[in-house]
C-alpha cells in the first residue's frame, strides 16, 4: 500500500520541492499557496487514516479487491445449492432414459448373458456414484479444534486467528480452516478436505466410468436415433409441401409418433451429455490422480512448486514430506491396509475413516522403509 501511494504522490511531492526551491512563498500568489496548504493537510489526514508501516503492495491489492472477493465467495456459496440440484437432475435424467428408452430396446436384441452383465455392472456403478456423491456432500471435510493447545501447529491463520496445523488452509467461502484442504467444490457445495477427499475422488472416478460406459454402450443407438431425427426433419418438411399440394382424397405422408420422437431425442441427449461429462470430468479425475500419486493436494501443488524453485535457486533439492511413494500414497488415501480392503473399501461402498486425524502426519506402520527415510529428510 505504501509503495503504491508513493508512486502516486511522487510527482506531486516533486512539484512541491521545486516550488520551495524557487521561493514560492515570496513570489507565488495566495491562491497557489492555499492550494499547497490544503494538499499538505489532506495528505496528513490520509496518512493518519490509512498509513501502516507493516503494509505493502499486496495489502493494497487485497484491500482494493476485497469487495470482489466478497461477491465471488457469496455467489459461489449460493450457487453451490444450484449446482448440487443440477447434478442430481442430470444424473436422474440419464437413469430415467436408461430405464424408459434404452432398456426396452436392448431387451429385444441382447442375449441373456449380455443382459445380465449390463444389469449388474450398470447398477454397481450407479450405486457407487450415488453413495460417494452423498458422502462427499454430507461429510464435513474436517476442521481444526479451537481452544486446544496440545496440537502441533505450523502457523496462525490470519483470518481465524487460531493455530493452524500442517496442510490446513482457510476457505474463504466456508469462512473457516479446513484440514488437508484440497479445494472448495461448488458441485458438492462443500470443501474437499481430510475426511471427504476420498469420497470426492471416488465420485469423480466412478462417474467418469459410468459416462464412458453409457457413451460407448449407446453408440449404435445414438447413430440410429440421430439418423431417425434427420429423417423426421425431412418428413416434416415433405409433409408441409404435401399438405400444400395434395388434393382432398390423397393420403398424408407417414410420420413418427410422439413416443418415437421423444425416444430418439432422449438417446441423442444421453450420448452427448455422457460424452461431454466423460471428457471434462475424466480430465479432472486424471489431474487429481496425479496429485494423489505425488502425495499433494491442489493447494500444496502451488506451494511446493514455489518452494521447489526457491530451493533450486540455492542449489538444494526439495522433497515433499508427505510423499510416501506412489503405491503407498494411494493406500493412505484410500485407507487400504490389507489386500482384502481393495475389494471391501474401494470396489464396494465403504464409510471407513481415513488414516490419521488430519492434524499430525506420521507415516502409517506399513509404509516402506524408503518412504520413511524420505519423511525424515
From Swiss-Prot:
Recorded family membership: Belongs to the DHHC palmitoyltransferase family.
Name by which UniProt lists this protein: Palmitoyltransferase ZDHHC16
GO MF terms held by the record: palmitoyltransferase activity; protein-cysteine S-palmitoyltransferase activity
Catalytically driven reaction(s): L-cysteinyl-[protein] + hexadecanoyl-CoA = S-hexadecanoyl-L-cysteinyl-[protein] + CoA
UniProt note: domains: The DHHC domain is required for palmitoyltransferase activity.
InterPro entries per the UniProt record, alphabetical: Palmitoyltrfase_DHHC, PFA4/ZDH16/20/ERF2-like
Active site, UniProt feature: 185 (s-palmitoyl cysteine intermediate)
Keyword Endoplasmic reticulum among UniProt keywords: yes
All copies of domain DHHC, residue ranges: 155-205
Membrane-traversing stretches: 78-98, 117-137, 199-219, 267-287
Entry membrane topology: Multi-pass membrane protein
Tissue localization of expression: Widely expressed.
Subcellular location: Endoplasmic reticulum membrane
GO biological process, one term: telencephalon development
PROSITE patterns the record matches: DHHC (PS50216)
Enzyme nomenclature, EC number: 2.3.1.225
Primary location group: endoplasmic reticulum
GO cellular component: endoplasmic reticulum membrane; Golgi apparatus
Keywords: Acyltransferase, Apoptosis, DNA damage, Endoplasmic reticulum, Membrane, Transferase, Transmembrane, Transmembrane helix
Summary of the function given for this chain in its UniProt record: Palmitoyl acyltransferase that mediates palmitoylation of proteins such as PLN and ZDHHC6. Required during embryonic heart development and cardiac function, possibly by mediating palmitoylation of PLN, thereby affecting PLN phosphorylation and homooligomerization. Also required for eye development. Palmitoylates ZDHHC6, affecting the quaternary assembly of ZDHHC6, its localization, stability and function. May play a role in DNA damage response. May be involved in apoptosis regulation. Involved in the proliferation of neural stem cells by regulating the FGF/ERK pathway.
Sequence ranges on the Cytoplasmic membrane side: 1-77, 138-198, 288-377
Amino acid at each position: 500500500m505504501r509503495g503504491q501511494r508513493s508512486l502516486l504522490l511522487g510527482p506531486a511531492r516533486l512539484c512541491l520541492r521545486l516550488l520551495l526551491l524557487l521561493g514560492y512563498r515570496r513570489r507565488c500568489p495566495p491562491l497557489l499557496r492555499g492550494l499547497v496548504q490544503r494538499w499538505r493537510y489532506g495528505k496528513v489526514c490520509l496518512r493518519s487514516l490509512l498509513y501502516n508501516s507493516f503494509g505493502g503492495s499486496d495489502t493494497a491489492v487485497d484491500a482494493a479487491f476485497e469487495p470482489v472477493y466478497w461477491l465471488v465467495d457469496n455467489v459461489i456459496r449460493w450457487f453451490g445449492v444450484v449446482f448440487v440440484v443440477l447434478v442430481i437432475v442430470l444424473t436422474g435424467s440419464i437413469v430415467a432414459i436408461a430405464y424408459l428408452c434404452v432398456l426396452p430396446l436392448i431387451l429385444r436384441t441382447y442375449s441373456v448373458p449380455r443382459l445380465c452383465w449390463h444389469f449388474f455392472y450398470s447398477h454397481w456403478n450407479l450405486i457407487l456414484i450415488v453413495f460417494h456423491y452423498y458422502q462427499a456432500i454430507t461429510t464435513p471435510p474436517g476442521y481444526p479444534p479451537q481452544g486446544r493447545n496440545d496440537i502441533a501447529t505450523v502457523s496462525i491463520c490470519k483470518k481465524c486467528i487460531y493455530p493452524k496445523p500442517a496442510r490446513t488452509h482457510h476457505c474463504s467461502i466456508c469462512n473457516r480452516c479446513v484440514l488437508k484442504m484440497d479445494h472448495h467444490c461448488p458441485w458438492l457445495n462443500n470443501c474437499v478436505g481430510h475426511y471427504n477427499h476420498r469420497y470426492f475422488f471416488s465420485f469423480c472416478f466412478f462417474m467418469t466410468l459410468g459416462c464412458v460406459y453409457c457413451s460407448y454402450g449407446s453408440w449404435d443407438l445414438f447413430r440410429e436415433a440421430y439418423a431417425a431425427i434427420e429423417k423426421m426433419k425431412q418428413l416434416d418438411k415433405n409433409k408441409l409441401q404435401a399438405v400444400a399440394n395434395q388434393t382432398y382424397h390423397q393420403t398424408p405422408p407417414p410420420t413418427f409418433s410422439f413416443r418415437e420422437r421423444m425416444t430418439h431425442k432422449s438417446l441423442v441427449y444421453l450420448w452427448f451429455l455422457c460424452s461431454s461429462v466423460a471428457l471434462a470430468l475424466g480430465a479432472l479425475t486424471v489431474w487429481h490422480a496425479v496429485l494423489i500419486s505425488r502425495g499433494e493436494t491442489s493447494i500444496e501443488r502451488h506451494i511446493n512448486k514455489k518452494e521447489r524453485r526457491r530451493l533450486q535457486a540455492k542449489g538444494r533439492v526439495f522433497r515433499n514430506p508427505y510423499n510416501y511413494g506412489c503405491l503407498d500414497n494411494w493406500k493412505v488415501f484410500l485407507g487400504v491396509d490389507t489386500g482384502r480392503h481393495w475389494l471391501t473399501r474401494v470396489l464396494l461402498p465403504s464409510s471407513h475413516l481415513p488414516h490419521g486425524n488430519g492434524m499430525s502426519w506420521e507415516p502409517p506402520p506399513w509404509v516402506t522403509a524408503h518412504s520413511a527415510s524420505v519423511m525424515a529428510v
